[in-house]
């Protein structure tokens, strides 16, 4: 709860700072001057007050509350700095931002219209459910594993912003794929362990011949991993934290391994330990590893893991797939898509939901 208040205060101050810039630059252009600036600023601040009022209530506010409370708050955090930067560029370019400056008004209108269009595209992208089908080719694949179908779900981030309808759509897509094995690679919940209940409500009953396996993500750790762990096991999932289990398909024995997450403090049971994860796997054993954070892949690859499934990055929620670029690319060695090293492969799932702002483009 303290962390929630701290984040809320930071965002409130961020909002105020952005609106000081916006007001100072664009006040002469806006009809009504400072009064209009204050009204617009209040529309951005009001949702944060509503979020305070919502503390302690059910993790699932109504659709109407999500519409006026959660969405405007996060979109404001995304677009306010863009609007402020736009104003600075306008001044630097010498646009006449005086009260009678027609060019300034046109520029403001075009900028606001462009941002509104971008917001709609991003919102549509965040609501869109995409099923990606990939063929994974492995050298010297045991014959018994040929054609095995794995469904990976990652980064659902179930929380106040998540609709049950969306969760039902995801569950239906998983069933339709008729997988041999289901891998849930972390961040099942967003901020609160209690949100594992609506997650369980949507996915209880999912099954696959080889099993349903889940691992922790950083948000599961933040929310309280012990409670999330118990909730996942209660719905019949096999939870893997720094351990591997043997499975058999068509007479071929192989291993599914799951790591902890770097969000866990060193020495805690949920902190990643690759050595312990693979301790039970023989040197010749074919292994599929589940690791929420792709930063763990190099260590897994060094130990001969054939395939690693990760998530975490969301591809930065803004990406240009054809160029292999995402908003996360400048910050992460492995940010999106497929990677290969010394016979080991990594696939990074873009995530089944969004984090924070309901905005995704190209992801």
Give short role names for the model-derived ranges.
Residues 67-74, 136, 151, 169-172:
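Short amphipathic alpha-helical coupling elements at transmembrane boundaries
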Residues 102-146, 150-152, 158-163:
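Canonical alpha-helical transmembrane segment with a positive-inside/aromatic-interface signature
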Residues 1-127:
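Non-catalytic terminal accessory segments
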Residues 141-363:
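Soluble catalytic domains of enzymes that build or remodel membrane lipids, polysaccharides, and related
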Residues 25-26, 120, 136, 256, ...:
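Generic structural hydrophobic/aromatic packing signal, biased to beta-strands
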């Amino acid at each position: 709860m303290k962390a929630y208040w701290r984040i809320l205060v930071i965002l409130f101050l961020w909002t105020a700072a952005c609106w000081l810039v916006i007001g100072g630059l664009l006040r002469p252009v806006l009809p009504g001057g400072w009064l209009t600036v204050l009204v617009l600023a209040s529309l951005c601040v009001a949702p944060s007050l509503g979020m305070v009022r919502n503390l302690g209530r059910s993790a699932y506010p109504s659709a109407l509350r999500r519409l006026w409370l959660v969405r405007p708050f996060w979109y404001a955090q995304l677009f306010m700095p863009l609007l402020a930067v736009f104003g600075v560029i306008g001044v630097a370019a010498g646009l006449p931002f005086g009260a009678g400056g027609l060019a300034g008004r046109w520029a403001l209108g075009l900028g606001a219209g462009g941002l509104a269009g971008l917001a709609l595209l991003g919102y549509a992208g965040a609501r869109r459910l995409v099923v990606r089908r990939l063929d994974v080719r492995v050298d010297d694949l045991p014959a018994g594993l040929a054609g095995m179908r794995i469904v990976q779900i990652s980064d659902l981030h179930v929380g106040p912003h998540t609709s049950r309808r969306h969760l039902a759509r995801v569950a239906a897509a998983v069933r339709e794929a008729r997988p041999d094995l289901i891998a849930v690679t972390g961040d099942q919940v967003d901020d609160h362990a209690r949100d594992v209940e609506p997650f369980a409500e949507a996915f209880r009953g999912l099954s696959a011949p080889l099993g349903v396996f889940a691992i922790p993500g950083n948000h599961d750790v933040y929310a309280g991993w012990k409670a999330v762990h118990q909730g996942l096991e209660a719905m019949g999932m096999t939870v893997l934290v720094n351990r591997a289990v043997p499975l058999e398909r068509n007479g071929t024995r192989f291993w599914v391994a799951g790591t902890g997450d770097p969000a866990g403090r060193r020495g805690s049971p949920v902190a990643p330990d690759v050595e312990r994860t693979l301790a039970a796997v023989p040197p010749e054993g074919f292994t599929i590893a589940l690791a929420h954070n792709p930063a763990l892949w190099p260590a897994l690859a060094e130990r001969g893991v054939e395939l690693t499934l990760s998530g975490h990055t969301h591809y930065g929620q803004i990406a240009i797939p054809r160029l292999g670029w995402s908003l996360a690319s400048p910050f992460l060695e492995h940010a999106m898509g497929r990677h290969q090293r010394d016979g080991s492969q990594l696939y990074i799932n873009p995530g089944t939901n969004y984090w924070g702002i309901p905005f995704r483009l190209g992801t």
